Amino acid sequence: LCKHHSSEQVNLYIMDFSSESLRVFAEAPQVGEVMVSGDDEKITNLFKLLQQEMNDRRQLFAAYGGDIQSYIRESGNNISNIVVVINNFAAFLEQYEEHEENIIYFTREGTKYGIYFVVTAVNTNDIRYRILQNFNQMYVLQLNDSSDYANVLGNVNGTYPSKYKGRGIFKDDQVYEFQ
């Protein structure tokens, strides 16, 4: 996203609850903030910002069909997409369970306003169904049990990632492998 999109096109907010290696993106002009465990005030403020942005965009888009694509097409104006990254969702939820309802709301309603979430998890059951159902696209890296692929993606027609590090699969019209 940082390589192919300007800060006028996308704004990233990154919460890293794993190795904190995503701090490397902190200086990118598209990144508003990189937050880690213990950044309580920053995380609370992010959810306030997202709520305000959602309210503002709801009003702004109302005269143009109510969604970001219609607004851009009909008004001729551009507005940046907002992408929130949560690396290691289970650790995030363990520390900030009070924000779970916010996550459910933003992942369900946010896409029409240009607010998107990218969430990582170590185990297939780290993300509760109430949240998981709000994601249209999932990418799965190596899992221990082949039945876990179907638990996440549905029927994978016997397609599993090669046993090379970094390989995974995702499902669109069919199942694809990626590196």
Per-region residue spans from a language model:
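P-loop/Walker A phosphate-binding loop and immediately adjacent motor/lid segment at beta-alpha junctions
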Residues: 154-168
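Conserved P-loop NTPase motor module
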Residues: 95, 99-101, 165-179
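P-loop NTPase catalytic phosphate-binding loop
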Residues: 1-67, 73-147, 151, 159-160
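Polar low-complexity intrinsically disordered regions enriched in Ser/Thr and small residues
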Residues: 68-69, 169
